[in-house]
């Protein structure tokens, strides 16, 4: 996590890109962005996925109401089957139109993260990071949910043998009446 902030942009921005992932979540209002030269009108609950190198800019036209946006900068991560520091949407587009349930979850999470930045308590960074991980998992579930379910879920590598043993026991408890093989 590089940064998180809530902003009400009042002027148009300049074309720019980042060498890290920047997520821009629209809390309210409409946000007009030019991304790689193409215009996108983002609504509340939409997420701009600014992968490294993506050229984008915010534009505010005369008479338009300013949106409220939350910016989150991330680095030093790598999702399986994606380039480092990137979150690739299936259609290759830079904007994710969140479903109603995800929108509700993200609204709550980003508000909680913003509140956490203001309270200045010990462990603040780790709390925000934990919320960010939750946000990323929810995004991945919407983006790749159906496809990954067919592949038995996402791959989360763990070096903790205790975690693996607990998962095996939980699986056996849930499926004790079924035929269980090592292939499962």
Feature locations, PLM:
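A hydrophobic/aromatic-rich effector-binding and dimerization subdomain
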Residues: 1-10, 52-119, 136-151
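Short, conserved beta-strand element in jelly-roll/cupin
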Residues: 16-33
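A generic fold-level signal
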Residues: 18, 34, 42, 64-66, ...
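A short, compositionally biased micro-patch
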Residues: 26-28, 51, 175
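Structural motif
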Residues: 30-32, 39, 55
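Short acidic-glycine-tyrosine-enriched beta hairpin
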Residues: 37-52
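Short, Lys/Arg-enriched, Trp-marked, Pro/Gly-tolerant hinge/linker segments that flank
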Residues: 94-102, 117-128, 137-174, 178, ...
